[in-house]
Amino acid sequence: MTKLKKVMISLVAATLLLLAGCGSSAVVKTDAGNVTQDELYEAMKTTYGNEVVQQLTFKKILEDKYTVTEKEVNAEYKKYEEQYGDSFESTLSSNNLTKTSFKENLEYNLLVQKATEANMNVSESKLKTYYKTWEPNITVRHILVDDEATAKEIQTKLKNGEKFADLAKEYSTDTATSTNGGLLDPFGPGEMDETFEKAAYALKNKDDVSGIVKSTYGYHLIQLVKKTEKGTYAKEKANVKAAYIKSQLTSENMTAALKKELKAANIDIKDSDLKDAFADYTSTSSSSSTSTSN
């Protein structure tokens, strides 16, 4: 779960806010001496200060210009919940996270996405060019196993008439989908492992099954559930635009958008220990114009 680290930072941010300026009150008492709130604040600032002040500052700047609704956050949360299945809560817990703190981070990420989208130049010519290689979303089931021998064993059972979904429940090591018969959410080009995606799009008819596909995750068998024919540009324009925008939500473009937002906010860092917190966002480089040129 790639966003968990930022959630952990946001929890530290909340602690820093509570501790800032609290003074000499003890948070831990020992016979050897006390650990004061000031000492804890300074130690946490040294370790996490730059990352925390970045997130707190950007959140305040972005909230002033963009709105993320509870419905949007819940929709994003549900995607992760479905992706991780029964292991979702334990994954949060093992990373010292709660549902609330994870949703707070999702809200922040959505704010950054909206700022990035606002910084894009989505022209008609760019969409038409993108349409040429764009394909509609595809829906498949898959069975993931660790070794080729097991994949061949499953192939034999499929040839003998056993159902793909039943075999996914029995064999697949992808715990997020195995209980649902291996069913994956619809996906488009560029969203999955390249080898997996190529094999999935090569399937022509409903219920067709691929050969054994080796990816970075292991060995797959893929069954086609739904594949929509590509329509005309006029018919598909809304889908093409959504896919294009999604493809442009890269770290490079997000950084470029945040640089622009930071410059417009006229920030003034008062704590000398944090003077370099925004160095990556105030330096002048070619990347600062990346998102407007895509």
Swiss-Prot record:
- Domain of life, per lineage: Bacteria
Q: Which GO terms describe its molecular function?
A: peptidyl-prolyl cis-trans isomerase activity
Q: How does it sit in the membrane?
A: Lipid-anchor
Q: Which GO terms describe its biological process?
A: protein folding; protein transport
Which EC class is this protein assigned?
isomerase
| Localization in the cell | Cell membrane
Q: Does the keyword Transport apply?
A: no
Q: What is its main location?
A: membrane
Q: Which InterPro entries match?
A: Foldase_PrsA, PPIase_dom_sf, PPIase_PpiC, PrsA_foldase, Trigger_fac_C_sf, Trigger_fact/SurA_dom_sf
Keywords of the record, alphabetical order, are: Cell membrane, Isomerase, Lipoprotein, Membrane, Palmitate, Rotamase, Signal
Q: Which first-to-last residue range defines the signal peptide?
A: 1-21
The PpiC domain extends over: 135-226
Give lipid-anchored residues (N-palmitoyl cysteine). Answer: 22
Query: Which residue(s) hold a covalent lipid per the annotation (S-diacylglycerol cysteine)?
Result: 22
Sorted alphabetically, which PROSITE patterns does this protein's record hold? Answer: PPIC_PPIASE_2, PROKAR_LIPOPROTEIN
Provide GO CC annotations from the record: plasma membrane
Catalysis: reaction(s): [protein]-peptidylproline (omega=180) = [protein]-peptidylproline (omega=0)
Q: What is its EC number?
A: 5.2.1.8
Function in brief = Plays a major role in protein secretion by helping the post-translocational extracellular folding of several secreted proteins.
Member of which family? Answer: Belongs to the PrsA family.
Task: Tell me the protein's name.
Answer: Foldase protein PrsA 1
What organism does the UniProt record list as the source? Listeria innocua serovar 6a (strain ATCC BAA-680 / CLIP 11262)
From the broadest rank down, the organism's phylogenetic lineage runs:
Bacteria, Bacillati, Bacillota, Bacilli, Bacillales
